[in-house]
Amino acid sequence: MDIECTPYAMAYCYVTPSRAVLFINTARVTPEAKAELETNGITLAEYDDVLKFLAAETEPQTVLAECSTVNYAVYQVLEQNPALTVKDGTDPLLMMKGVKNETELAHTKQAHIRDAVAMVRFQIELESRLAAGETLTELTVDEILHKYRSADDKFLVESFDTIAAYGGNAAMMHYHATPEDHAVLQRKGFLLVDSGATYLDGTTDILSLIH
């Protein structure tokens, strides 16, 4: 993973009416993914070659770039290449992501159902082990959640680091238990669990308060 808790790769994509070039760490692209991309007319190039590519582009193009967010080095190269005309505008992909189609909505629902099953199994195990007198900590919460989520064949990665906060720790903003600093769970009080996962069909973010 290029970004923690995110199953995506850092990349640039240069798209024109006649070609598409994906700049990515090609060593991380599986043969299956490479074949699929090439079948769809997408050429792979190394991530670090994007600036050199843009500087050498000779085909006249008007390039849409969201200037408030685009990498400044990329923007400079675009501006300095006489073959390229930069047009500032909102990334159309962001606009499209803001409105889900029926397939995306259905997949999101299935991801949440799948995650709910993992959450129920987690709570059953947590309660039964506490009732049996076992010593559990905030770190144990993370371990149990990961066990049930990762057992699903569509699981990819946690969508963020699990926040398991018992008692007074739940009042701390973005609290995170560590091996050096964590609380032991008791059969009283409150346990706040903020967690989520990314599956092939959707991403979840679940906040639970367990008494």
Predicted regions, residues:
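Active-site neighborhoods and metal-handling regions in enzymes and metal-associated proteins
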Residues: M1-H211
